[in-house]
Amino acid sequence: MAVIRTVRFEVAPTDVEEMIARRNALVAEVRNAFPDLTEARLALVGERVWIDSWRWESAASMDAAVQAVATGALPAAGPAFALTANAAGESAEIVDER
């Protein structure tokens, strides 16, 4: 079953362009390693607060990608996360889509 991984974080306004570039590099790297990533959407909540929502075809693929980030197997992750603060993530199973 499909799942969503959502991370809420803060970025200084002066770092926004660089954060987006680094995030795009991370999305490309993750998609290359884990093709079950089907969507990656970035939304701005306020001047500093962002929500990044990634849709996965399976929890197993999502978990493997999260583990790859934790172990340093995805080199683009470190630079992407370096510009963020107060990150909090959660995962949820999709139960209905229309």
Which role does the model predict for each range below?
Residues 1-72, 81-98:
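Short S/T/G/P-rich N-terminal loop/turn motif that feeds into the first structured element of a domain
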